From Swiss-Prot:
Glycans are attached at N236. Residues 253-386 are annotated as: P domain (Extended arm). Ca(2+) binds at D98, D413. Keywords: Chaperone, Disulfide bond, Endoplasmic reticulum, Glycoprotein, Lectin, Membrane, Metal-binding, Repeat, Signal, Transmembrane, Transmembrane helix. This is Calnexin homolog. It comes from Aspergillus fumigatus (strain ATCC MYA-4609 / CBS 101355 / FGSC A1100 / Af293).
Length: 563
């Protein structure tokens, strides 16, 4: 048992030293956000049909719209009153000097556009559309998608609206249960000349956090497309197979003039005409019958009514028997019935009738006259056409954001529209790949840390030792569930105390099993006494180590303030 005491003493000393070391470590910690090193924005040298980083001359390219939104479902006029600004992020800013286009108003219609230096013709080429979205207040209900507008010499930026013809719509949209990344393109029917929107099926979910998200769309001349989020592919498909309605109509359609013959038999099954109802089939037998074997419970009070006059009720003072009639007190449930199985006349319960069979019907058999499900004959589709290259989008002359959102401060940046996958990746490495890790670090640093919780018990050890120890242990267990190593660092006194207790119990068990003393009862008694003593020392270790650590920290703080 002297060995156990020595071990316990050593652990207590270790816990004290660990507590002092931890106090010093906590004292040295600085604000995590100040330790995050941010890169500085440098304009790219990449050239593209359209590349926007919202540098100082951005307003020479972008024009807010002052048009009115067209809405056939409402008589009210909606103007694009939402304001725009170019500024650095105010939330999780991951790059010094990096400005973006920011939505400034909540619950407002916003529209802004920029013309391309020259129209973008994608015939026979790869189209790459890439841009950053940073919802600084998260994205709960609103759009953050862009539109590539159809080339039109008559297009005036100030008149840009939801009615302005676009070629491609791409980007995130979130509201309620809707959460997706749009990819829609308008396709012209070569026979009728009419345009039809083709919507990508099974769209991926949008990212709605306050971090910058990079959305990339790649459409290749082989009609395949790919959507990437933060540089990772989230959707692959083809323009000919993954859009609704499909680009090309069916070659054949149902003949609208074809009619089902009058003698066509649609019934696959019919009642068996040779089947007969069994002689013992009783259709009149009831579904339930009285349970003749049931007996009245012994505590059933047949003479007690289920309700009685309310003994606490009193006749109103203004009650006139001549005018109002005899006053009858209201009734209340008989309290005696609550204590027994029931009151009043007893009737036996019902039970399912074993002889019940219900109405007899003949079993079904295959209909020998069945001809199958009738379908009209097929005829060639007069509106059929085949467009094998829908990626040859119509020429595009501008890019615009035409959105409505309940959140402001949505930031757009680093827009690339061109034909080079390599250049888009290079731009990503120059911008997103540098700022995004910083934003993640800033977000992590801004989260409340576990050690920020009430690590100090609500009472002192002298006031309530049991409560003090329990709160310390609970705090240690909560930390250990997420990070055991951090738990030992944060509450070393509890770790040391629990370790001492565990080691003592192991030694007691080993000693009890391997003891060869002729007096086992005495040995067991000594073991229990030793275990009890160890527990007391472990509790003392928790309090003394904590007090030692607190004292050390207090002394150091005092010296710091004095300096």
């Amino acid at each position: 048992m002297r060995f156990n005491a020595a071990i316990t003493g050593a652990l207590v000393s270790s816990a004290t030293l660990m507590g002092q070391a931890h106090a010093e470590e906590t004292e040295k910690k600085a604000d995590a956000t100040s330790l995050v090193e941010k890169p500085t924005f440098t304009p790219t040298t990449i050239e593209a049909p359209f590349l926007e980083q919202f540098t100082a001359d951005w307003d020479s390219r972008w024009t807010p719209s002052h048009a009115k939104k067209e809405d056939s479902k409402s008589e009210e006029d909606w103007a694009y009153v939402g304001e725009w600004a170019v500024e650095e992020p105010t939330v999780l800013n991951g790059m010094v000097g990096d400005k973006g286009l920011v939505v400034k108003n909540v619950a407002a219609h916003h529209a802004i556009s920029a013309k391309f230096p020259k129209k973008i013709d994608n015939k026979g080429k790869t189209l790459v559309v890439q841009y950053e979205v940073k919802p600084q207040n998260s994205l709960v209900c609103g759009g953050a998608y862009m539109k590539l507008l159809q080339e039109n010499k008559k297009l005036h930026a100030e008149e840009f609206s939801n009615a302005t013809p676009y070629v491609i719509m791409f980007g995130p949209d979130k509201c309620g249960a809707t959460n997706k990344v749009h990819f829609i393109f308008r396709h012209k029917n070569p026979k009728t000349g009419e345009y039809e929107e083709k919507h990508m099926t099974a769209p991926p979910a949008a990212r709605t956090t306050k971090l910058t998200t990079l959305y990339t769309l790649i459409v290749k001349p082989d009609q395949s497309f790919q959507i990437l989020i933060d540089g990772e592919a989230v959707k692959n498909g083809t323009l000919l197979e993954d859009f609704a309605p499909p680009v090309n109509p069916e070659k054949e359609i149902d003949d609208p003039k074809d009619k089902k013959p009058a003698d066509w038999v649609d019934e696959a099954k019919i009642p068996d005409p040779e089947a007969k109802k069994p002689d013992d089939w009783d259709e009149d037998a009831p579904y339930e019958i009285v349970d003749e074997e049931a007996t009245m419970p012994e505590d059933w009070l047949e003479d007690e009514p289920t309700s009685i006059p309310d003994p606490e009720a009193e006749k109103p003072e203004d009650w006139d028997d001549e005018e109002d009639g005899d006053w009858i007190p209201p009734t209340v449930p008989n309290p005696k019935c609550n204590e027994v199985s029931g009151c009043g006349p007893w009737t036996p319960p019902m039970k399912k009738n074993p002889a019940y069979k219900g109405k007899w019907t003949a079993p079904l058999i295959d209909n020998p006259a069945y001809k199958g499900i009738w379908k009209p004959r097929k005829i060639p589709n007069p509106a059929y056409f085949e467009d094998k290259t829908p990626s040859n989008f119509e020429p595009m002359g501008a890019v615009g954001f035409e959105i409505w959102t309940m959140q402001n401060d949505i930031l757009f940046d680093n827009i690339y529209i061109g034909h080079s996958i390599e250049d888009a990746e290079k731009l990503r490495k120059e911008t997103f790949d540098l700022k995004h890790p910083v934003e993640v670090a800033l977000e992590e640093a801004s989260k409340p840390k576990l050690e920020e919780k009430a690590a100090t018990p609500s009472v002192s050890f002298k006031e309530a030792p049991v409560t003090y120890v329990r709160e310390k242990v609970d705090y240690f267990v909560g930390l250990a569930k997420q990070d055991p190593i951090n738990a030992v660092k944060q509450v070393p006194e509890v770790a040391g105390g629990l370790g001492a207790l565990l080691l003592t119990m192991i030694l007691v068990i080993v000693g009890a099993v391997g003891a060869s003393s002729p007096a086992p009862a005495a040995a067991a008694k000594k073991g229990k006494e030793a275990a009890s003593a160890a527990k007391e020392k472990a509790s003392e270790a928790v309090s003394s180590a904590a007090d030692t650590a607190k004292g050390a920290a207090t002394k150091r703080n005092t010296r710091s303030s004095a300096q």
